[in-house]
Design a protein with these regions (language model features):
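Structural and coupling elements of P-loop NTPases
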Residues: 1-370
Length: 371
């Protein structure tokens, strides 16, 4: 592939949320639907023994929370996806703020019962300052939740951004029936089991007037869905990708990450609309991803990721050109030439040596020099 083709197919984004909104669970299910893992783990579960892929540090497994950003990458339908799962707790917010400088878009997870919470507002302020494109995923619809339109109004008011639902829930809590995808015109039917594999049932319903809708969810919920969709189409403007890319409009999805519902719709739409690697602003000029000279920046240094070794790992975001292993690069601040003999790609704690990396990629390298 050419450099431009490599750039175009990359998507690098962070998942952010207030603590316990389901951020790490959603990340795990995106990995599952993307084919990066075959069985989803859980943050805390008596049924599921496998831990969350992104919570690989011992303290994270003990506490059931994320304390440091984890980076995971996978291929999906021709796109190269890089997910950064960030800490939600305020004590570790600095890690999240640094991570937001290295991503091209963001998915915000909101608990459907609690709505917009304090840490979500703070993180959204950072996104707004950087004009970062935002997608909202309203989670935990399998539990009693606020009404969908109330949640949409709350997101607009509290996060100060226009919204456009691209999926819509059919009830919530004990009567939750599933999610209707307004983007693809299909229905995902809900079952109450915690699914570990990506096998959600999807029914194509291109015309909501079809009697197939009653056959799938019953007369009462079919009538309610038709009314809700009519209201959505009447109240909200059509989805404008340009406004989304400028950080002015947030597409909204509903679902239950732990039960897989709404996750596939989110992933499919994300791959279509999310931005490729964006130009990087510097003190003197804008660096375009397609420039031939390799540039990048270290946005985080993490010590002691491996408990068996005293290590310092630099998280490096590639901004332009092609990164090559064993090639000398100028460290601008020190004026020194640096060579990376064992740069690695991320999959949480797992690592694999890479020979090349392209704009949008997050790589890691051992820090023997001050960077």
């Amino acid at each position: 592939m050419t450099l431009q083709e490599e750039i175009t197919r990359r998507r690098t984004f962070a998942v952010i949320a207030h603590p316990d909104a389901g951020k790490t669970t959603l990340t795990e299910k995106l990995l599952l639907f993307g084919g990066a893992i075959h069985v989803a783990g859980a943050v805390k579960s008596n049924k599921i023994k496998k831990g969350a892929t992104s919570d690989f540090m011992e303290i994270e497994r003990q506490r059931g929370i994320s304390v440091a950003t984890a980076v995971m990458g996978f291929e999906y339908k021709g796109a190269k996806i890089n997910i950064l799962d960030t800490p939600g707790h305020e004590d570790f917010a600095e890690d999240t703020f640094r991570t937001l400088t290295a991503v091209d878009s963001v998915i915000i997870v909101i608990d459907g019962a609690k709505g917009v919470e304090s840490q979500t507002r703070k993180l959204m302020e950072v996104c707004r300052m950087r004009s970062t494109p935002v997608i909202v995923f309203i989670n935990k619809l399998d539990r009693p939740s606020k009404e969908p339109f109330d949640l949409l109004d709350e997101v607009e008011k509290e996060l100060n951004i226009r919204v456009r639902p691209l999926a819509f829930p059919i009830s919530n809590g004990p009567t939750f029936k599933g999610v209707y995808n307004l983007y693809e015109k299909n229905l995902s039917l809900f079952t109450s089991d915690e699914k570990l594999t990506a096998d959600a049932s999807t029914v194509e319903i291109s015309d909501l007037a079809s009697s197939e809708l009653e056959a799938q969810i019953g007369d009462k919920f079919a009538a309610q869905l038709r009314s809700d969709v009519e209201l959505v189409e009447g109240v909200y403007d059509d989805f404008d990708r340009g406004a989304y890319l400028r950080g002015e409009l947030a597409p909204v999805f509903f679902g239950s990450a732990v039960n897989n519902f709404g996750v596939r719709e989110l992933l499919e739409c994300f791959v279509r609309i999310a931005p490729s690697p964006c130009p990087a602003p510097t003190e003197t000029r804008i660096v375009e991803p397609a420039e031939p000279k390799m540039t990048g920046f270290v946005f985080k240094i993490h010590a002691n990721m491996d408990p068996n070794h005293r290590d310092r790992i630099a998280f490096l975001k590639i901004c332009s050109g092609t990164f090559e292993r064993n090639k000398n690069y100028l460290h601008v601040r020190s004026g020194k030439q640096l060579k990376f003999s064992s740069p690695t790609a991320f999959m949480a704690e797992k690592k694999s040596i890479i020979d090349f990396a392209y704009p949008g990629e997050i790589g890691r390298a051992s820090c023997r020099e001050r960077v």
